[in-house]
A protein has these predicted regions:
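Active-site gating loops and adjacent loop-to-helix segments of metal-dependent hydrolytic enzymes
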Residues: 31-54, 89, 178-199, 236-260
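Mid-to-C-terminal alpha-helical segments outside catalytic/metal-binding sites
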Residues: 3-5, 25, 29-70, 97-104, ...
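Hydrophobic faces of well-ordered beta-strands that scaffold small-molecule active sites
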Residues: 23-27, 71-73, 111-114, 140-142, ...
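Short glycine-enriched loops at secondary-structure junctions
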Residues: 29, 118, 174-178, 293-295, ...
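Short S/T/G/P-rich N-terminal loop/turn motif that feeds into the first structured element of a domain
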Residues: 335-392, 397-414, 425-445
Length: 445
């Protein structure tokens, strides 16, 4: 029984994760022009946390290391509005055109959701139309509040109408509330707690104004594992009848509004956080998000690998969370990866019976690390002979010969090879010529 459990772990850890293009819906493009604009207004510490450095080469390197095919770019905080609507609109136009250029320069690697010069609603509508219709933005990014103007505010109705008419994706992101004690920010950065409250506040304000029911073609993404919504929603629903009776609110269909939301798993996507999130949404509305570059790339790669390994135990399909749900949300904007010829081989391994459990542990670990950290390792799929459990077959798919050579030189592969040297009775490697790789990959999706 123990051997079967270890084998199940091995199968899960070595399952194919590279056959489908993974999508990161939560990342930020911190362009030089953005930093210059923010610094010119003395706002680089406006959110109580330093704005990290960013460049496209490092972003792509992180994506390759993490196995991410496509990232959705958005503007970070703070919102580029400092009292002059025309200035803000001009900068948002410049920023959106820069993001559109990145999308064009690296086809398939980047999408972008446009920045809008809120709280100037008229100019925001104009920029939304230009970004979506001319630049072919993949959606818009809206701050939870723009200097006190919260999502759900009736002032935003003209913008919601325009976005709804274009079936727009809205990426929401927390920003500093207008009335915040500066001393409090200095001691405990907003991102550690207030961002979660801020997101919850904004989404519940949208629900209270029935925005998502009245504009059913909007697709709104909530960041950071739903923030405090799983905890706040039961209280909100419980108080709603009283609020309606007292005339503070109008009747709204809370569940219908919440059902239209999508949720990214950026931040601390612990098992408990994901389980809590699933009390208010469904598996097909969960999306992967990194929050790059606000977290160091090595930490993000490790966290993504951990999440990917834990999803099945939570009853979730890694392919759906990391790829399919985002592909459905953004439609044709997310490219289908094209595959040429790959290096494909089959390993036939006979393991010493009394060392089978130890071998499977080694194999599980090398599979987990390889799939999480090596973009050139497309698939490591293990199988056990039904009649002889000591016979293990591993289907290996590599991007090319170079990827295979790089794989066998890694520290984790060497640990596996040296640690199992006395566990293997025989090893046979069969190199193959893939005849229908493209068709296989399409079917595997």
């Amino acid at each position: 029984m123990k051997t079967k459990r270890i084998l199940a772990s091995l199968m899960m850890s070595m399952t194919t994760i590279g056959l489908w293009a993974q999508v990161d819906v939560h990342s930020h493009a911190i362009t030089a022009s953005y930093m210059d604009f923010v610094k010119a207004h003395g706002a680089e510490m406006d959110e109580g946390f330093p704005i990290p450095e960013w460049n496209v080469e490092d972003h792509l390197a992180f994506m390759d290391q993490a196995g991410i095919e496509t990232a959705v770019l958005t503007m970070p905080a703070p919102q580029p509005w400092f009292g002059d609507g025309a200035e803000s609109a001009a900068f948002c136009r410049k920023y959106n055109e820069e993001c559109a250029a990145l999308k064009a320069r690296y086809p398939g690697r980047f999408l972008f959701c446009a920045a809008l010069p809120l709280p100037d609603v008229k100019r925001a509508v104009e920029e939304a139309v230009y970004a979506l219709d001319v630049l072919h933005a993949d959606g818009v990014k809206l701050a939870t509040n723009s200097y006190g103007q919260y999502l759900g505010d009736p002032e935003l109705e003209p913008l919601m109408e325009v976005l709804n008419s274009r079936n727009a994706v809205i990426i929401t992101h927390p920003h500093k509330p207008s009335a915040v004690n500066d001393k409090l920010i200095a001691e405990v950065p907003l991102a550690s707690y207030e961002y979660l409250a801020e997101t919850t506040r904004a989404i519940l304000n949208m629900v209270a104004h029935d925005v998502l029911v009245r504009y059913p073609d909007l697709k709104v993404v909530v960041p950071h594992c739903g923030s405090f919504l799983p905890n706040a929603l039961p209280r909100f629903k419980g108080l709603l009848p009283v609020m309606i009776k007292q005339g503070y609110m109008k009747p709204v269909d809370v569940d219908a509004n919440i059902a239209r939301l999508y949720f990214d798993l950026a931040g601390a996507a612990t098992d408990d956080a994901v389980r809590s999130l699933l009390t208010i949404t469904t598996a097909d509305h969960l999306l992967y998000g990194s929050d790059y570059p606000y977290v160091a790339a090595p930490a993000l790669v490790a966290a993504k690998g951990s999440l990917q390994q834990r999803l099945p135990a939570l009853g979730l399909d890694p392919q759906a969370v990391l790829s399919d749900n985002a592909r459905r949300l953004f439609g044709a904007a997310v490219p289908i990866r094209e595959y040429g010829e790959k290096l494909v081989r089959l390993a036939e391994i006979e393991v010493v019976p009394e060392k089978l459990e130890a071998y499977l542990k080694y194999a599980s670990e090398v599979g987990r690390i390889s799939m999480a950290t090596e973009p050139g390792v497309i698939a490591l799929f293990s199988m056990q002979d039904k009649t002889d459990p000591c016979k293990i077959y591993i289907l290996e798919v590599y991007a090319d010969q170079q990827a295979y050579q790089a794989h066998i030189q890694t520290a984790h592969f060497r640990t596996y090879k040296e640690g199992t040297a006395d566990m293997v009775r025989s090893l046979k490697l069969i190199d193959t010529v893939p005849l229908v790789m493209a068709e296989f990959v399409k079917k595997a999706r």
